[in-house]
Amino acid sequence: MKTLETRKEKKAQGKVLKAFGNLLQVTFEGNIRQGEVAMVHVDNLQLKSEVIEILGNQAKIQVFEDTKGVRLGSLVSFTGDLLEAELGPGLLSSIFDGLQNPLVDVADQAGLFLPKGIYLSALDRQRKWDFESSAKVGDVLFRGDRIGSTKEGRFHHFIMVPFSLYGKYRLTWVINSGSYTVDTVVAKAIDESGQEHSFTMVQKWPVKNALIHGEKIKPTKMMDTGERIIDTQFPLMKGGTFCTPGPFGAGKTVLQHHLSKYAAVDIVLFVACGERAGEVVEVLREFPHLIDPHTDEALMKRTVIICNTSSMPVAARESSIYMGITIAEYYRQMGLDVLVLADSTSRWAQALREMSGRLEEIPGEEAFPAYLSSRIAEFYERSGVVSLRHGKPGSITIGGAVSPAGGNFEEPVTQATLSVVGAFLGLSRARSDSRRYPAIDPLLSWSKYVDTVGNELSHQVDGWDQMVKRARHILFNGNEIGKRMEVVGEEGISMEDMLTYLKAELYDFSYLQQNAFDKEDAYCPLKRQIALFQLINQIFDTTFDFHTHDQAREFFLDLQNRIKNMNFISFDTEQYRKVFAEIKSIIEQQSRK
């Protein structure tokens, strides 16, 4: 029988031979394996590290902490375990670092400045959970099958047979329903060889291995984000992937925060990987006070935050990315829709570059390792929809922010990401400088899900996909005419071209741009988007007759301001309906002149 359980043999020991930053070369006795966790003894502390290269009786390990104090001959003890995530009830509403230490508990124990060498349990060992058993004695179970469940917020958190166990297990004992801690044995079973196994509410899984049990199926459902430019022009799907590259200050982090607040998913994993501490603090301050628009509950109840700021050790950036996706995979196996937001994958790639340089590997483009593309693809491939034996499928949607230096989309990290994602939401400096937020460039960005989502929305609105294509076409034409106007002026273009340009500007200003700090405009539900988009298309369809360019400009400026102001009014209220009717009346009056 195949198992991933900890090996019982004597654990290896070693000593430090060389130190190069957080890369240590050690000599060891015993058996170790790639990815194994090792503890480096420094004074009275033990620093967590990971084996990244083995050659004979020597190994190279990367330490997840500052290596100040490590000296020649320092003792290294190998644990026999891979770097693992602790999975069980209590993960939601938590704030972890890249090694899954609960930062609130660390702060209570060590104060405001995080010392090195402190590792705490990810789950609260004292808290009791109301466990309700669903399996019976005599049932034959496989990995991932449900033993029972407990209530975690508004979700049923299913207690499953550990994914590290393979083969058949026959239940011999199940605990009565009641309140228990996560370490309480809730069931016992025997495997095919007659060996007994005890199951608690906690299980562990190596973060570098994909946790998946079930068949991957094609994404079919749209992920509603409440962001008009995304849902209409560049839609996302549950189980899909997308990236948001852009220069510094273009609004990547604000966009990621918006998605974590308003995306129509069950659970959000926010991985702040190498972000500035100020931005992480903003998330930690803001999120506990925000309300989920879909459930009217606190947003933190569906959120897990993993913080690894730019001031923390570089090696932990990699572990934070993998830790986040592993927790997401665990919740996917319960049939939940999960959104993973990594901000920013560029900082993770920089950590790979730094370690690759210390390992003296042959560099690729811009000194990034040659295997950069495969690592990025590996991460995004852990997304997807999985068909489960118990009810509805679960999904993971991955969105990665990319921070190319100077907004250069030709650099290796952006190019490696673009080759594997399903949607590209490119933020441009030109749009952010002209205060056109969100600064997603409608001329650069693309989505592979446009046709699938278009077919889905065409059931609600006839010809939705054609309307979207025409709006994009008008945007392109308006942009070309705008460039011509810069050279020849307004007088040098025809009235027809002038109207196309003004329609494109109205669509951009009134529909694609959105105020993230306004209560009403921050989140635009799909029903409201459809009503507004139909109004915009009515303007596209209307034939206007103006005598001068100035007259046309004056009319369209007034019209776009009216539509913009309507976006700040609560949807479907008496005031909204009144303003909506006034706008339609103005359009009809002008078309009859």
Curated annotation (Swiss-Prot):
InterPro entries according to UniProt: ATP-synt_VA_C (IPR055190), ATP-synth_a_Xtn (IPR031686), ATPase_a/bsu_AS (IPR020003), ATPase_F1/V1/A1_a/bsu_N (IPR004100), ATPase_F1/V1/A1_a/bsu_nucl-bd (IPR000194), ATPase_F1/V1_b/a_C (IPR024034), P-loop_NTPase (IPR027417), V-ATPase_asu (IPR022878)
A GO term for molecular function: proton-transporting ATP synthase activity, rotational mechanism
Biological processes annotated in GO: proton motive force-driven plasma membrane ATP synthesis
Keywords per UniProt: ATP synthesis, ATP-binding, Hydrogen ion transport, Ion transport, Nucleotide-binding, Translocase, Transport
Enzyme kind, highest EC tier: translocase
Function: Produces ATP from ADP in the presence of a proton gradient across the membrane. The V-type alpha chain is a catalytic subunit.
Disulphide bonds in the chain: none
Catalytic activity of the protein: ATP + H2O + 4 H(+)(in) = ADP + phosphate + 5 H(+)(out)
Protein name: V-type ATP synthase alpha chain
Pfam families found in the cross-reference section: ATP-synt_ab, ATP-synt_ab_N, ATP-synt_ab_Xtn, ATP-synt_VA_C
Coiled-coil regions, chain positions: none
The EC number(s) this enzyme carries: 7.1.2.2
